[in-house]
Amino acid sequence: MKLNRLWFCLLIIIPGFLVAAYLGSHFLTDWYWFAEVGYRQVFLTRLLSEVGIRLGTIAFFFLFFYLNLLFTRKSLHLSPPEGRENWTLKEYLIDRFITSRRLGILYLLLSLAGALIFSPLAAGKWLVVQEYLRATPFGLADPLFGRDVSFYIFKLPLYHFLYKLLITAVVGAVLVTGFFYFIFNPRELLGLRRGHFSRPLVHFSTLVALLFLIQAWGFRLQALDLVRSSRGVAFGASYTDIHALLPGYNILGWVAVACGLIIVLNAFRRNLKLVSAGILSFMAAYFLLVIAVPLAVQKFQVEPNEFAREEPYLRYNINFTRRAYGLDRITIQEFPALDNLTPASLREEGATLDNIRLWDYRPLEQTYSQLQEIRSYYSFKDIDVDRYTLDGRERQVMLAARELDQNKLPDRARTWINEKMRYTHGYGLAMNPANTVTAGGQPEFIAGDLPFHSSAGLQVNEPRIYYGELTGDYVITGGTAAEFDYPVTGEDNFVETRYQGRGGVPINTPWRRLVFAFRFHDYRLLMSNGLTPQSKILYYRNIQERVRKIMPYLRYDADPYLVVAGGRLYWFLDAYTITNMYPYSEPNSGGFNYIRNSVKVVIDAYNGSVDYYLVDPGDPLAQTLARIFPGLFKPREDMPAGLQQHLRYPPDLLSIQAQMLTNYHMENTMLFYNKEDAWSIAEEMVGDKRQAMDPYYTLMRLPGETQAEYILMLPFTPARKVNMIAWLAARNDGPHYGQLLLYQFPKNRSIYGPMQVEARIDQEPRISQQLTLWDQHGSQVIRGNLLVIPIKGSLLYVEPIFLQAQESKLPELRQVVVAYEEKIAMADTLAGALQVIFGTQTPAPAASPQPPSQAATGSPGNLSELIKEANRLYSEAQDRLKQGDWAGYGENLKKLEQVLQEMGQKVAE
């Protein structure tokens, strides 16, 4: 007997201990980690709020169920009648097993079980409560109820939550109390004992009446939800919703109240016909007011005169959708699409031409992998695009972080020591200008290699990457053995290092080693002799996981980008505030109908520090989060200047806005209703597939501006057509960051769209023959992104052509196609293609003053020296032309012009 009890205790204690250890280790390691990253207050706010709401919900359900069960106690017939020989089986069982004490325990257990079963209704609802308490007004009222938009986003969700709790609690109480009454006192529950006050019937009727009263409130909530109705021609309350469904919900609310009163009255009058009539009336009213009448109004009033009926609500939808997606902030300008580009005007736009992105990220990823991974265990997750000031000039570059991918370690090297303590970090980055190419068709790397080296003066004092996109598992630093840093010449030669950063949690006591062993299910953390008092464990190292762990209430961009600033490597991650509760705003394909890029997250690749910068302080959702989590967001002004230079408008956000703009650029309700001026995002060919263009960055001078700036742009075409109608630009630099500009083409002209240019490239005989010839000789032709480049009021179209041999995974940039108006040219370089289209006899460009050369200033020199100088300047100009250096090309031509003038004077003498 004792042995059985021992086994029973072990079966209870051991699983209980394991569950407690698992939960406790997760809590403690999260507690340590939040302290390490400096966000323990965020952790406490979340924890205490979640626990408080969950305990409050459990207490509510427990008390509600328990009090209702206690009320049944006096009404249950637990004492069987005298005359044991006449007892039924039920009466015998009650006498044998049911006592007052046992019933009390049963009530407690049932109430607790019900509370625990229904407590998950509160999961994650703590944020709903906090947002209700700390709501920030939008300063904009909806046109139907006149309530501020913040009511629908921050207040209404809490009311829906409370409604669900109340309905669940009352239904649960009805079922449980009804069961006890039916088992122990069915006659009084059913009102069969006339002339006698029926306590069970009154209790049960009160609960059912309460259910109807709560449902009356539910109808009011459903009425408020009409501002997000999808019934009409546009999102939001439509004519039918307002003139049929809204009155229907209001009437149903009063019908529900009346039914509740009838049911309470029935407990005393016991008129089942009245109750039946009330319930049937409620059901009939629901069918009539929620289904039949709205359907009839829609069919017979709205559809025959749809625009006239829906016109006011279309206007609401247009206005609120434009506000919700920030489309109302777009400045609209005309773009003339001139056809008067000349070599001289091109030279004035040297900064634009010097930064046209020729390298498509898709083939470039393969090139980076082949040329810069260097060892099999390194990987480039993806290629980022940014701008840097290099050698005194702003250049658009492609770059990627060289991360260590432990999954690519050789099998023999995949030991616990190697994965956790030796191969701990990536190293450096690779970078190439977006517009230059070597003679072999490869990118011109201006930064890269191992150890890190930059030919462009890019300074990186700390190239090690402990936190990145491929850093999935934990690692331990400060062990007895040094860490692998990077390989050097020779098969087994490498450099070692020791982590000196601020990241990581100390794991210097047996207790902590035990906690982390449970947390990561890894007994070797307890057994290893490689740990020292200086050892630290680095976890949550994947930057996406890291930021979501701190603040999961923002939506994060899927594509972080690497930034070099102040000699260190940082990750930038765009964070969005979104909601699907914005009234009258059309939802997008992601299910939300409001979005702002209010927060920029910066992660130090070495230390793992995470900073949240609020770049749109006017966003009420971000303001509300800032109130809930004081100190979480830093003002944009606190961001170091070196990081602010790399702020980018997110391509994902521009894509969402552009998709909404295809319809919501039309503010005229008649145009919108008929979709007469609907647009599409311009398409291009990628491989052999036709797909919508992605937004792309470029350095260019916007119309009316004096300096080139970094912009993100995307062209539009009319719906179901291929000619271009407009392009959208987002500014990225300095005080202009976030400004949106929409440039529309003249309505009376047809402007070539990207797909038309793609077709013209295919139809151009020389280009088509050359591409076919390469294909026939075993080379795969890869056509890169077709870029539309606005310049001097005109449009250039540029498409790079890559070749990849069948046996090679190394694409080469071999040709560049340029289209302008009716001309198309393909050449080895962008400069060469421009030369074919615009010719070579061009006047010297306007340039900033340069120190005059001896020949250029007319100082003493004979004719032969001037000829040599002219040849030298011409050769340099051609070299710069091949490199795509238009600014340098223009400078050389100006000097050459001065030398030629000097030669003319010498000849005249």
Swiss-Prot record:
It holds the Pfam family UPF0182. GO terms for cellular component: extracellular region; plasma membrane. HAMAP family: UPF0182. Belongs to the UPF0182 family. It is found in: Cell membrane. It is a multi-pass membrane protein. This is UPF0182 protein Moth_1139. Residues 843-862 are annotated as: Disordered.
